[in-house]
From Swiss-Prot:
Record's GO cellular component terms: cytosolic large ribosomal subunit
GO molecular function: structural constituent of ribosome
Protein's name in the database: Large ribosomal subunit protein uL29
The gene coding this protein: rpmC
Family in the record: Belongs to the universal ribosomal protein uL29 family.
Swiss-Prot/TrEMBL keywords: Ribonucleoprotein, Ribosomal protein
Lineage, opening ranks: Bacteria, Pseudomonadati, Pseudomonadota, Gammaproteobacteria, Enterobacterales
Organism: Pectobacterium carotovorum subsp. carotovorum (strain PC1)
GO biological-process terms attached to the record: translation
Amino acid sequence: MKANELREKSVEELNTELLGLLREQFNLRMQAASGQLQQTHLVKQVRHNIARVKTLLTEKAGA
């Protein structure tokens, strides 16, 4: 997911995206804890995507 794609979205869409990413992060953490996660790099990718969305939400709130 690119920041440019996210910048085009509205605040409601970003909040929906954030909720989906948080759910995905939870599921990945549960898989990692139970030893079922094969692609551990996905945890980092999701964490960075969450940070991107939160940054854009903060920018839009200030503007």
